């Protein structure tokens, strides 16, 4: 008994990349008790991010997961706020990626609709304008999108606390 941890991740992955029956059938071979899905950031960098389309991609993914893993608990996480790089003349600068807030809201809504758990990392890390604090605290990397090692450790601590709080309140 105990915890068997398995991580699957690909740089730049999006929900649409994992919405594949063959992939989900392979995932089912692991017989997970809990599946934690932490995606959504990459979708927010598209030129025409659309929350309805994004929600549909999550719903399609969840439909496959529920079909192939009917006894597996599912936890969706929302993306934390991040920056995006923009050009201003010859200069490159960073601005808040407003789409992460929209993606977080969409994930929360889909989780409620699909009756799966959701951990709101966007709000937990401070919500709107939190990327400034995470970056100045050196918890966000140079790209201003991904966390540093310390940032990911903090994310893990926050998730652990949320699990324990939920467990203690059952």
Protein language model annotation of sequence segments:
Residues 1-60, 67-68, 83-85, 99, ...:
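Conserved SGNH/GDSL esterase-like catalytic core that processes O-acyl groups on lipids
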């Amino acid at each position: 008994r105990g915890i068997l941890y398995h991580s699957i991740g690909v740089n730049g992955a999006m929900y649409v990349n994992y919405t594949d029956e063959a992939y989900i059938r392979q995932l089912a071979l692991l017989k997970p008790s809990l599946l934690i899905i932490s995606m959504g950031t990459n979708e927010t960098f598209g030129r025409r991010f659309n929350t309805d389309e994004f929600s549909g991609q999550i719903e399609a993914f969840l439909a496959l997961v529920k079909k192939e893993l009917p006894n597996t608990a599912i936890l969706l996480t929302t993306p934390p706020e991040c920056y995006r790089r923009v050009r201003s003349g010859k200069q490159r600068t960073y601005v808040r990626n407003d789409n992460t807030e929209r993606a977080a809201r969409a994930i929360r809504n889909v989780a409620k609709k699909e009756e799966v758990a959701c951990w709101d990392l966007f709000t937990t890390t401070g919500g709107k304008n939190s990327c400034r604090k995470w970056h100045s605290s050196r918890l966000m990397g140079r790209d201003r999108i991904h966390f540093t090692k310390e940032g990911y450790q903090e994310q893990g601590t926050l998730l652990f606390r949320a699990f324990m709080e939920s467990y203690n309140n059952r």
